[in-house]
Amino acid sequence: MSNYDVFNGDADGILAWHQLRLTHPRDATIVTGVKRDVGLVSRVNAGDGDMVTVMDISHAKNRKDVQRLLDSGAIVEYFDHHDPSELIAHPNITYHINTEPNISTGLIVNSHVKGKNCLWSIATAFGDNHMELATNMAKAEGLDDEQILLLKQIGLTVNYNSYGQTVDDLFYSPEEIAKAVKACGSDIFRFTEQSDIFSTLLKNFSNDMSSAVCQEPYSISDNGVIYKLPNESWTHRVMGSFSNHLVSTNKDLACAIAVLNSDETYRISVRSSLNNPHGAGDLCKKFGGGGREKAAGINNLPDSELEEFKEEFEEAF
């Protein structure tokens, strides 16, 4: 029998995976990738009795391959917070899905493991921009301000490192981050001491954010703003973090960051406003993307559709 752990290469995917495996250890083949590489289940060839755990990637985007695994006799467990579309009725699949706006996969796992090693889930909440929720959870655990800041920085920087057209845009591959996280055991603060990974991410996160806030908006409306950025490694890395920064600094604001791809299409990151955290996923679905009510994206929007996207964005928000 073989085991497979399939998870998004962002903070939510990696840290949720680690928290789960701290409580339920299992040797498994790791399958992960950059944040927008959502079709990860397609890489798994599991057979009868094999166990596949999937975390923080859209069921809607992987349903066909999940069905393939079930048809082959595999046993699947699925943790996620994205819109799943149609679930599969099968005795060999167990779903842990919650699509509420203020939830992360890490928080779903935290509930599943009854709060064991919960600091990892707090970092996922910080990474997914649930700042108030994460801070309140950290305070409830008795953490001081310095520890809370470190948890926030871990969540933000690991999430930041996941964005890129390819792994070449990142400072560390998701596999390298997962290995460093696993080496921490139950102590999340050991991540700050893992070689130079944390310091490198923190320094470059700060540099890229400084570059982003100097950019001029492409479009401004009453309740939203759109930025259009060039095809550079730093723009791909920072787009999600910059999106979260914009909506955090104005809780009535929705935003979209459109970054030019190498094929002249646009990769787009959308955030609904924090005071009305709805609509991002539905907007992106209209253009072949997907996501959650609060945060969503499009991988390849043709330049010819950018104006239509702008109009739909303004109508949605």
Q: Where do the PLM segments sit?
A:
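Loop-centered beta-sheet repeat module
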Residues: 134-184
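Short secondary-structure junctions and interdomain/linker hinges
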Residues: 130-133, 161, 188, 216-223, ...
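Generic surface-pattern signal
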Residues: 46, 71, 114, 125, ...
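Short N-terminal helix-initiation segments at or just after the protein's N-terminus
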Residues: 59, 162-175, 193-207, 237-243
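Oxyanion-binding "anion nests"
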Residues: 99-100, 180-227
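Extended interaction regions within the primary functional domain
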Residues: 43-45, 88-90, 96, 136, ...
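Low-complexity, intrinsically disordered regions enriched in charged/polar residues
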Residues: 34, 123, 148, 171, ...
